[in-house]
A protein has these predicted regions:
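Terminal low-complexity/IDR "tail" segments
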Residues: 88-89, 221
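Catalytic cores of glycan-processing enzymes that make or break glycosidic bonds
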Residues: 101-131, 178-181, 211-894
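Aromatic-rich carbohydrate-binding modules that target alpha-glucans
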Residues: 2, 8-52, 62-83, 138-186, ...
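Boundary detector for helix-to-coil junctions that initiate low-complexity/charged tails
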Residues: 91-95, 100
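Generic secondary-structure microfeatures
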Residues: 9, 23, 136-138, 149-151, ...
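Structural beta-strand segments of beta-rich domains
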Residues: 1-5, 128-132
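Residues in well-ordered beta-strands of folded domains
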Residues: 6, 20, 60, 80, ...
C-alpha cells in the first residue's frame, strides 16, 4: 500500500516541509522530506513497512536540516486506513496551527465537560472511496455530527437521510464514501449537529456550502480530504468550580487530614451544585524534616511521588490485630475533631499504620501482577524516590550533601533496588508499597471525577526542593548555587525567597525538555487541567544569591544586564563601589535601629570614613546574620536582625551573577536609604533607567526565552492549561499566553493595569480564570475588613452603592460579589471554598481569620487549614447548595 501525502504551504527559499510519522514509541518519528515544484504544493510518498490500520503524523518546516516550525502537536493528523481494497491512498491535508478554541480539544472538555464515546471506524469494502474528515469541537455530550449534501448518497439535503459520521479521534469526525455511488465528482455538502433530544432540528454549521471536486480515480484508489474546522452558532462554554487543597477536606471518615477518599466526596458536592471544576493544590510528597515545616505543598521532594498523608486508610485492608485497629480508630476520631491539621501526629499515625500493613500484606502485594505492572511503568522515578526516602531516614536528614555515603545515586544501586531478590530491594520496597496504593487511589478519584463530568485541576509548582530526589539524581538540570523567589509584590515587601534551586535551561533545552515533558505526562494521569505556578518563571526567574535571606538582592535570570557606560548613558554618574556596596551612614543606623544604634555600631559594622560604615566580615551576608541570631526570638533581637538584613540589601545595583561587568538596578530600591541619599536629578535618571530595564529593555528577550520552553511543555499533554500570571508582569507574558492559548488568572483586587485599583470583571478575557482570592491571599471576608477605606471605595465604585460599606461582610453582599464574578466573560470562575461559604452567614466559619491558608510573607507558615464542616454536613445543607446552584445557573455557566 502506498500513501501519497499532499499539503499546501508557502515556504520561503531554503525551507523544506517534512512529514513526521509518529511511531507510538515515546516521541519517536519517521521523517520524510517532501517535494515541491512551486514552493507551495508539497507531496511525498510513504509505504508502511508493516501492516498498519492507523497513522498519526504532523508536518514541520526545516531549514538546513533543523526544525524551525511545526504544527500543533496536541492533535496530530490521524489517518484511518479503512478501505480494505485500497492499494493507494491520496491524502490532501492542510497545515494546522494551534486553534483559537484549542481548549475544546483538551481532556477537560473531551473527557469531562463534553465527553462522548469515540468509535473505531468500520472497514469499507469499496473499490474506490473518498474519506472526509473534519474537526468539530463544539459538540456536546450525546450529540452527533451529520453530513448532508447533494445527491442520493449524501441525502439530497434531507436531514433524516444525512450520513452520521464517526468520531474517530477527539473532536474529529470522519466518514468513508463509496465513489461508485456518487452521481457527480463534485460534492456539495454541509455539516450539522444532531441532538438526540431534537433529532429533526439540526444545527447547521456557519458559512457557505462546502465543495470538493474529486480527482480522476482508478480501482484501488482511496482519496482522503482533511477539511477545515466546522463552526456552529453556539455560545462559548463557561464553567464554575471550587478551589480547595486536598489536605483541607474534612469528612466523617478522615484521619485528621483530607485524603483521596475525601476527594471523591468533594467531587460529589461539586457535581451536585452544578459546578464542573475542582481545583486542588500540589499533592506530591514534601517530607524533608518530618515536622510541620513539611506542610508547605510547593516544596516537593519528588515531582512524581504522592504525599503519603493523602492515603485513605479506609480503602486499605484492615489490620489483623483488632486491638491495633481500635487504637487507630480512637486516634483517628481525636485527630479528626481538631479544628486544624496536626501535621506531625497525622503523618506519624498514617506511617505507623502503613508499616504494620506492609508487614502483613506487603509480601503478597509485591508478587501480584497489578503491582508488577505499576512498578514496570514507574520504576524510573520510583526507585530513586524510594532510595532517597531510605537514606533520608537512615541518616536523619534529607540534605544529601551531608550524608556520609550515597551522595550520588549509582546505576548499581538502581539495579539492586529493582531486583526483588536483593537485600536492598527489601529495605526500600515499603516505599513502593505506599506509592502503589497512593497511585491507585488517586487514579480512582480521577476516574470518579470523569464519571461525574467534573474536571480535576492540579497545580504544577515552579520549583523543586534542593533537598529532594531530582536535585540528588539529576543535578545537571539545576543551579544549586542560587535560589528562586519573587520580587516584592502585594504579598511581601521584601520579596519572596522560596529556596528552590533555579533551572539550568541550557541543559534542559538540549534534550527537548524531557524532564518537564515526563513531569507533565505523569500529572495528566491524575488531572485534566492544571495551573502553572508562577508562569513568569518560564520567561525569567527571580534568582537570589545563596547567601541572601530576603528577595531584594535578586535579579531576573536570564536578563540583559547593563554596563557602566549604559548606566551613565541615562544621566546617572555610576560609581561602582558606592552603588553596589551597602550604603550605611550614621543617619541610616539611627533611623533603622533607634535605641539599638550603639550596639550595632559596636558589634556589627565598622567605620570606613567620616560617617560611612560597612558590615563586619562576620555579618556581611544575610545568611551570616541569620546564623548569628538563630534561636533568638525576643522583640529586640528580631528588630536588630531584620535591621541588619535591611542594611545589607541597601544597594542601588546588584552585579550580574554570570558577568561581573554588568549590573541590574536593585528591585524596589526607591523605598531604600541609598535612593533617598541621591540628588533629585540622579533620582530622575535612575527612575528612567529602572523603568526601562524592568518594563521595556527585556521584553523581546524574555518573549523568546519563553517560546523556547513553553510550546513544548503545554503541548506535551491534552490537559487544559491555566497560568498564575500575577506579580511583576512584563508585556511579553500576554503575547506568549495569547499565542499559546493559555488561560490567564484574573483577580479583581489585583488588576493587571497598574493604573486601576479594581479590575473591571466585564473586561476579563474569555481565555481566563476569574477568582476572588487565592490560597496566598486573604479570603473575601478577611480582605473586606483589612482596609475600610479600600472596601468603601469598592462598595461605591464597583458595587454601585451609595451608603456606607457594612462590616463585617454580610452574606447578601458576598452573594452579589460572587454573582458578579460568575457573570464575567471568563471561561472558568473558580472560587475558594471559603469564598463560596461567605454567602451564608449561618454556615460560614465565625472567625474569618481562621480561613487563611497561606501568608507568603512568612516563609515558615504552617499550612494546616481545614474545612469547619464535614463534606457529609455540607451535602445536607440543601438551602445553601440550592443557592450555589442558582447563582451558577443564572450566570449561564454549564
Amino acid at each position: 500500500m502506498k500513501l501519497r501525502f499532499n499539503i499546501d504551504y508557502r515556504a520561503v527559499y531554503g525551507e523544506n516541509i517534512v512529514l513526521n510519522i509518529l511511531t507510538g514509541r515515546d516521541d519517536e518519528v519517521r521523517k520524510r522530506v517532501m517535494n515541491t515544484i512551486d514552493g507551495n504544493t508539497w507531496r511525498c510518498e510513504y509505504e508502511p513497512s508493516e501492516k498498519v490500520s492507523r497513522l498519526d503524523y504532523f508536518y514541520s518546516v526545516e531549514r538546513d536540516g533543523r526544525e524551525v516550525r511545526h504544527e500543533w502537536l496536541v492533535m496530530p493528523h490521524r489517518l484511518d486506513l479503512t478501505s480494505r481494497s485500497a492499494k493507494r491512498y491520496i491524502i490532501f491535508d492542510h497545515w494546522i496551527d494551534i486553534p483559537e478554541d484549542s481548549y475544546l480539544y483538551s481532556s477537560a472538555f473531551t473527557n469531562c465537560v463534553a465527553s462522548r464515546k469515540r468509535l473505531e471506524p468500520k472497514d469499507a469494502k469499496y473499490t474506490m472511496s473518498v474519506q472526509l474528515k473534519v474537526r468539530a469541537p463544539q459538540l456536546r455530550t450525546g450529540e452527533t455530527l451529520v453530513l448532508i449534501g447533494n445527491g442520493r448518497l449524501l441525502g439530497d439535503w434531507d436531514v433524516a437521510r444525512g450520513i452520521h459520521m464517526t468520531e474517530h479521534n477527539y473532536d474529529e469526525w470522519m466518514v468513508t464514501l463509496d465513489v461508485s455511488q456518487l452521481s457527480s465528482p463534485l460534492l456539495e455538502f454541509k455539516f450539522a449537529i444532531i441532538n438526540p433530544a431534537r433529532p429533526t432540528t439540526p444545527m447547521w454549521e456557519n458559512g457557505d456550502n462546502r465543495h470538493v471536486m474529486l480527482p480522476m480515480l482508478k480501482p484501488g484508489d482511496a482519496v482522503v480530504y482533511e477539511l477545515s474546522q466546522a463552526y456552529f452558532p453556539l455560545p462559548p462554554a463557561k464553567l464554575a468550580g471550587t478551589v480547595i487543597p486536598i489536605f483541607s477536606l474534612r469528612s466523617e471518615h478522615s484521619f485528621g487530614v483530607g485524603d483521596f477518599g475525601d476527594l471523591k466526596r468533594m467531587i460529589d458536592w461539586v457535581a451536585s451544585t452544578g459546578q464542573r471544576v475542582l481545583q486542588v493544590l500540589p499533592i506530591n510528597d514534601t517530607t524533608i524534616t518530618g515536622t510541620w515545616q513539611d506542610s508547605y505543598p510547593y516544596n516537593s521532594i519528588s515531582i512524581y511521588a504522592l504525599h503519603p498523608q493523602y492515603i485513605d486508610l479506609n480503602q486499605l485492608p484492615a489490620l489483623a490485630d483488632k486491638k491495633r485497629m481500635a487504637e487507630f480508630e480512637t486516634l483517628r476520631v481525636e485527630l479528626n475533631a481538631l479544628p486544624q491539621i496536626d501535621y506531625e501526629r497525622v503523618n506519624k499515625a498514617k506511617h505507623e499504620y502503613l508499616r504494620e500493613l506492609y508487614k502483613q500484606e506487603g509480601a503478597e502485594l509485591l508478587k501480584s501482577d497489578e503491582f508488577k505492572e505499576f512498578f514496570a511503568a514507574n520504576k524510573d522515578w520510583l526507585v530513586p524516590y524510594a532510595a532517597f526516602c531510605h537514606y533520608r531516614d537512615e541518616y536523619g536528614t534529607a540534605s544529601f550533601g551531608q550524608w556520609p555515603d550515597h551522595r550520588t545515586f549509582t546505576p548499581e544501586e538502581f539495579d539492586a533496588m529493582s531486583n526483588a531478590r536483593t537485600k536492598l530491594y527489601k529495605e526500600v520496597a515499603y516505599w513502593y508499597f505506599v506509592q502503589f496504593y497512593l497511585d491507585k487511589q488517586m487514579h480512582g478519584a480521577h476516574e470518579y471525577a470523569l464519571s461525574k463530568r467534573v474536571v480535576l485541576k492540579g497545580d504544577i509548582p515552579i520549583g523543586i526542593s534542593r533537598d529532594g530526589v531530582e536535585a540528588w539524581v539529576e543535578p545537571k538540570y539545576f543551579n544549586l548555587n542560587g535560589q528562586a523567589g519573587a520580587p516584592p509584590d502585594a504579598f511581601s515587601t521584601n520579596g519572596q525567597n522560596w529556596g528552590f534551586p533555579t533551572y539550568n535551561w541550557d541543559v534542559m533545552l538540549a534534550d527537548g525538555c524531557s524532564w518537564w515533558v515526563k513531569r507533565f505526562r505523569k500529572m495528566a494521569q491524575y488531572f485534566d487541567a492544571y495551573r502553572i505556578d508562577h508562569v513568569l518563571g518560564f520567561f525569567r526567574i527571580w534568582e537570589i544569591p545563596i547567601d541572601a535571606v530576603h528577595g531584594l538582592l535578586g535579579q531576573f535570570s536570564p536578563s540583559l544586564g547593563m554596563s557602566a557606560d549604559e548606566i551613565r548613558g541615562y544621566g546617572l554618574n555610576f560609581q561602582e563601589e558606592l552603588m553596589t556596596q551597602p550604603f550605611i551612614a550614621d543617619w541610616v543606623i539611627d533611623r533603622v535601629f533607634g535605641p539599638h544604634a550603639g550596639l550595632v555600631r559596636d558589634r556589627y559594622v565598622e567605620r570606613v570614613h567620616d560617617d560611612i560604615y560597612r558590615m563586619r566580615p562576620a555579618y556581611d551576608t544575610q545568611r551570616k546574620v541569620e546564623a548569628a541570631f538563630a534561636g533568638k526570638t525576643s522583640d529586640d533581637d528580631i528588630w536588630v536582625r531584620d535591621g541588619l538584613y535591611s542594611l545589607i540589601s541597601d544597594v542601588l545595583f546588584v552585579r550580574d551573577r554570570k558577568n561581573p561587568g554588568l549590573y541590574h538596578p536593585r528591585i524596589s530600591v526607591q523605598h531604600d536609604f541609598i535612593y533617598e541619599a541621591l540628588y533629585d536629578n540622579d533620582k530622575q535618571a535612575f527612575n528612567r533607567l529602572y523603568n526601562d530595564y524592568y518594563y521595556r529593555r527585556n521584553n523581546d528577550f524574555w518573549y523568546h526565552e519563553a517560546m523556547k520552553k513553553l510550546p513544548k511543555l503545554v503541548q506535551a499533554t491534552r490537559m487544559l492549561v491555566c497560568a498564575e500570571d500575577l506579580g511583576m508582569v512584563p508585556d511579553c507574558v500576554a503575547w506568549v499566553m495569547n499565542e499559546l492559548r493559555i488561560l490567564s488568572l484574573e483577580i479583581q483586587s489585583m488588576p493587571k493595569d497598574p493604573k486601576l485599583t479594581f479590575g473591571n470583571l466585564n473586561l476579563n478575557p474569555y481565555r481566563s480564570v476569574s477568582t476572588i482570592s487565592t490560597h496566598d491571599m486573604s479570603t473575601l471576608r478577611q480582605w473586606w475588613d483589612e482596609d475600610y477605606e479600600l472596601t468603601q471605595q469598592y462598595y461605591n465604585s464597583v458595587m454601585w452603592r451609595g451608603d456606607g460599606a457594612p462590616h463585617p461582610l454580610p452574606g447578601w453582599l458576598a452573594s452579589d460579589i460572587v454573582r458578579n464574578h460568575l457573570n464575567s466573560p471568563s471561561m472558568l470562575c473558580l472560587l475558594s471554598w471559603q469564598d463560596w461559604m461567605s454567602i451564608d452567614e449561618k454556615l460560614r466559619l465565625p472567625d474569618a481569620n481562621a480561613e487563611r491558608i497561606n501568608i507568603p510573607a512568612n516563609p515558615r507558615h504552617y499550612w494546616r487549614y481545614r474545612m469547619h464542616l464535614t463534606i457529609e454536613q455540607l451535602m445536607q445543607e440543601s438551602a445553601f447548595n440550592a443557592k450555589v446552584q442558582e447563582l451558577i445557573n443564572q450566570s449561564g455557566r454549564l
